[in-house]
């Protein structure tokens, strides 16, 4: 997870919750400001309890969290779900806690929880100031490099 400047790494042990409004309302999530991670565990219930023991050291701070209204959502009822991400290694800065919401879950891929697809990308992109992305190399480039090296080795052996 990166800080607000987009370059400073502020943690390596992130915990993320994909929550619908019937699990925990956005307003209730904001009410957890200043409370420990145990308060989130209690609010979410045993089904969403932490597995990382370091999470208990983290104090929730929502001062810099992305508010629903800044995402272009009219009010705290005009959304379907939201994503709660925070650092679990004991960092207590408010920049270690992020909240973002989405209006539409029509494209959510429920069969693969590792790839959450937001219904409207604009809601997530408006929180881009706090996130940083890293370009991943194309897998075929490595394969082509290996094939080229193998071909070169064969030519040398034949010569």
Regions found by a protein language model. Name each.
Residues 138-155:
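A short, hydrophobic C-terminal helix/tail in secreted or cell-surface proteins
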Residues 1-135:
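Mature extracellular "passenger" or substrate-interacting domains of secreted, surface-exposed proteins
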């Amino acid at each position: 997870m990166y800080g607000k400047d987009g370059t400073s790494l502020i943690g390596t042990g992130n915990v993320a919750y994909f929550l619908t409004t019937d699990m925990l309302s956005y307003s209730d999530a904001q009410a957890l400001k200043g409370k420990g991670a145990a308060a989130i565990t209690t609010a979410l219930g045993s089904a969403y309890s932490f597995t990382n023991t370091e999470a208990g050291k983290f104090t929730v701070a929502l001062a810099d969290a992305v508010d629903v209204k800044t995402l272009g959502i009219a009010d705290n009822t005009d959304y379907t779900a939201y994503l709660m991400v925070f650092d679990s290694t004991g960092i207590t800065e408010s920049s270690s806690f992020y909240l973002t919401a989405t209006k539409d879950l029509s494209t959510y891929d429920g069969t693969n929880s590792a790839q959450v697809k937001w219904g409207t990308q604009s809601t997530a992109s408006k929180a881009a100031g706090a996130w940083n992305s890293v370009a991943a190399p194309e897998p075929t480039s490595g394969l082509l490099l290996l094939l080229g090296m193998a071909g070169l080795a064969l030519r040398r052996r034949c010569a």
